[in-house]
Amino acid sequence: TVSPLPRYTRPREESVVAPREEIIPFAQSDAAIDQSPLSAGSRALLRGLLRVGSTRMFPGGGAGIEYGGLLKTAARPDYIAAHVVEAADHLRECKTDLLLVPGMSGYPVGAMYALAANTPALLLKKSKLGDANPNAYPAGAFVIPSYTGEGDVVMHADPAAVKDIVATIVARKLAEQTDQPVIELDLRVAGADDIIDKATMSQAVSESAVVIGEEAIGHCLAQHRLETADRRPANIHVSVVAWVTPLIKSYNRPREHLWQSFKLQPFAGLDLYTVHLDPPAIGVTGVGCVGFAANGAGSS
């Protein structure tokens, strides 16, 4: 059975061999970070990543960064609190109404962003793709390969959560427009994830956000008309206005992809221009290529 859901593919990436002498040893990383133009939030984030993380091969995506103890399996205010505040400031500057976060791995930091920015967030849950009833998934669902090698999975929002959150937003916007001849229902959505790799997931979530938002607002407007005598014409517009993430792999050109597709520049704590497996190291824009504290540290 061919699923009617939108399907996205992730290209595999390989690591780049780097001469050992070009890598700043972990023992010298503090000095390099202090001399960098990174913000306070990005400096603390990088120190935490180098201390608890490493690099390794992932079954579903090739060479990548293992950062579970920083962003997925622990909450470390000493390393990420300042970055969360900076990202929340960006969300507020973009006048974000709603945040979408894909999968459980992105939700810890996504929830932190949401609370810091005082913005409601929706988790796009990951489910195994089943052939029994491919039409059973809610609006905005899509299929994408799992980064951990589990095969194709379906990402979708909780319809009950969507309904309540969007209803609250729409009610506020309607209350602000009681004297207007035309109702303008604009929903400004942002995305958040623990990392932006090739922007495949970012594109999928952004396109999903428009579908989710338009359907939910349409239902809210119909309910409003049923309950009131309001028959004013209405315009519905859902736009993706921001992406926030601790990490972005700039060597995969995700910034260019998001600009071309959505005319937005993602906000990232650390811009990574290369990832090395042997020895484990990452190239960080503004700092250089820096080694991790321990080989194979922080696996999950």
Question: Model segments located where?
Answer:
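Short glycine-rich phosphate-binding loop at a beta-alpha junction
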Residues: T96-G103, V244
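PRPP-dependent phosphoribosyltransferase catalytic core
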Residues: P4-E13, A18-P37, S208, I212-S300
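Gly/Ser/Thr-rich loops at beta-strand to alpha-helix junctions
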Residues: G103-V109, D197-A199
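Short Gly/Thr/Asp-enriched flexible loops that form oxyanion-binding sites at enzyme active sites
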Residues: P108-N118, A204-S208
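Short, ordered loop/turn segments at secondary-structure junctions
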Residues: M104, K126-K128, I248, D271
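Short, glycine/charge-rich flexible loops or terminal/linker lids adjacent to PRPP-binding catalytic cores
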Residues: N118-V189, A199-Q203, G283-G286
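Structural motif
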Residues: L98, R188-A190, A242
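Active-site-facing substrate-recognition patch
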Residues: V16-T96, H156
